[in-house]
UniProtKB/Swiss-Prot annotation:
Pfam families the UniProt entry points to: DUF359
Organism: Aeropyrum pernix (strain ATCC 700893 / DSM 11879 / JCM 9820 / NBRC 100138 / K1)
Task performed by this protein: Catalyzes the GTP-dependent phosphorylation of the 3'-hydroxyl group of dephosphocoenzyme A to form coenzyme A (CoA).
Protein name, as recorded: GTP-dependent dephospho-CoA kinase
Phylogenetic lineage: Archaea, Thermoproteota, Thermoprotei, Desulfurococcales, Desulfurococcaceae
UniProt keyword annotations, A-Z: Coenzyme A biosynthesis, GTP-binding, Kinase, Nucleotide-binding, Transferase
């Protein structure tokens, strides 16, 4: 039996889908991607997506001692993927964020974790794609990494951008509520 819960969220306007599909920064793959991660000039790294998070762990596990956030939903290209093994020393968090939306729970969790400067894995029930916008919005001194399926990893060194020159795409989202179905015990 499942219980329907109403959760506050921000919905992606249809006319913004194409604009947000474009990379927010340079796209890298292979060794160039790994070098960008290893040479980050920022104080923390946030990796959004299952495949990208696995690549971040493989690249940064022994070489990076700074803050690290991994955000996963158990899917790649909307298909089930392997389970994320939580690395030792990481705190686990769970949020809900329906597809095509950014829940306020997910937004505030990411922003709060970026202020804490720890090591975290965030499991998303729903879809993690738009959580990259929360990381870009809140992670002023962070490197934000997310995947473009079939292309590579987008690496945005937010610490190198001048503050105040960019408007958050999140401001254009439509506030509302969404129904989330949760299994009852």
């Amino acid at each position: 039996m499942s219980v329907a819960l109403s959760i506050p969220l921000l919905s992606l306007p249809e006319d913004m889908r194409e604009a947000l599909a474009a990379a927010a920064g340079p796209v890298y793959s292979g060794d160039r991607f790994r070098r960008q991660l290893l040479q980050t000039p920022c104080s923390g790294v946030a990796c959004i997506g299952d495949y990208v998070s696995q690549a971040c762990i493989a690249t940064l596990s022994t070489a990076w001692t700074g803050p690290l956030i991994l955000v996963v939903d158990g899917k790649t290209r909307r298909e089930s993927w392997r389970d994320m093994v939580v690395p030792q020393g990481f705190r686990v968090h769970r949020v809900r964020s329906p597809p095509g939306s950014l829940s306020l729970e997910a937004y505030t969790t990411i922003c709060k974790l970026m202020e804490e400067y720890g090591r975290h894995v965030v499991f998303v029930e729903g879809e993690e794609d738009l959580i990259a916008l929360a990381a870009l919005d809140c992670g002023i001194d962070w490197t934000v990494v997310y995947g473009l399926p079939g292309v590579g990893g987008v690496v945005v060194h937010r610490c190198l951008r001048k503050p105040g020159l960019e408007n958050s795409s999140v401001l254009a989202f439509k506030p509302g509520t969404g129904v989330h179905h949760q299994s009852s015990p």
